[in-house]
């Protein structure tokens, strides 16, 4: 019962889509209506509003971190922590508050990994940054980071059958699956690069960010 309740709370936390909330609060178009139509920081950046993109990134990462931190803070067993990690991630992917139309989970997964272990989170984030810097593809960076996250986990904690390690692996698999469309576009040379600004219809109010 304790695990079920913790997972439910984590799912509800994950269901808060900061891309949609921040965009609405700042008078911007719904990120599900333009660009990749993905409610995530990269797509919000395509609106031209850097501040909104940063707030989205921080918010999505924070909710992942918060859910796992709370589970650890209240002394829940590793099985519960693993369930919480998966639940908050699934909440972002399929948010009950937004008709189950969520993002791809990159920032939320990063927050979860930071809460599991700071070194694990930072190593994975650094992997994303390196790939993104050299290739300018957010999706490619996410895919590479997703592949390396379980490997970093094994390097740090060994090959023990810790439930949290399985949660990390499950998140990586889900993240790759959520990027299946991006994989097709990458192979076809049609994927948008970081900084590309796609037309976003303003939903009342001007956008106050600069074009990259």
Curated annotation (Swiss-Prot):
Pfam families: G3P_acyltransf. One of its GO terms (cellular component) is plasma membrane. It catalyses: an acyl phosphate + sn-glycerol 3-phosphate = a 1-acyl-sn-glycero-3-phosphate + phosphate. Keywords: Cell inner membrane, Cell membrane, Lipid biosynthesis, Lipid metabolism, Membrane, Phospholipid biosynthesis, Phospholipid metabolism, Transferase, Transmembrane, Transmembrane helix. It is a multi-pass membrane protein. Pathway: Lipid metabolism; phospholipid metabolism. It is found in: Cell inner membrane. GO terms for biological process: phospholipid biosynthetic process. The chain crosses the membrane at residues 3-23, 78-98, 115-135, 155-177. Probably interacts with PlsX. HAMAP family: PlsY (MF_01043). Belongs to the PlsY family. This is Glycerol-3-phosphate acyltransferase. It comes from Burkholderia ambifaria (strain ATCC BAA-244 / DSM 16087 / CCUG 44356 / LMG 19182 / AMMD). The lineage of its organism: Bacteria, Pseudomonadati, Pseudomonadota, Betaproteobacteria, Burkholderiales.
């Amino acid at each position: 019962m304790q695990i079920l309740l913790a997972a439910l709370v984590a799912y509800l936390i994950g269901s808060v889509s900061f891309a949609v909330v921040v965009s609405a609060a700042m008078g911007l178009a719904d990120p599900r209506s333009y660009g990749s139509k993905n409610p995530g920081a990269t797509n919000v950046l395509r609106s031209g509003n850097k501040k909104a993109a940063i707030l989205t990134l921080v918010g999505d990462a924070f909710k992942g971190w918060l859910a796992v931190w709370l589970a650890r803070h209240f002394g829940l067993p590793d099985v519960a922590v693993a369930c919480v990690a998966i639940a908050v991630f699934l909440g972002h992917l399929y948010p009950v508050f937004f008709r189950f139309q969520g993002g791809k989970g990159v920032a939320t997964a990063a927050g979860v990994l930071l809460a599991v272990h700071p070194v694990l989170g930072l190593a994975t984030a650094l992997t994303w940054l390196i790939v993104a810097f050299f290739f300018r593809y957010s999706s490619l960076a996410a895919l590479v980071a997703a592949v390396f996250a379980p490997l970093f986990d094994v390097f740090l904690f060994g090959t023990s059958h810790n439930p949290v390690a399985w949660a990390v692996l499950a998140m990586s698999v889900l993240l790759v699956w959520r990027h299946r469309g991006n994989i097709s576009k990458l192979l076809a040379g049609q994927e948008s690069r970081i900084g590309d600004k796609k037309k976003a219809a303003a939903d009342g109010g001007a956008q106050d960010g600069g074009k990259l």
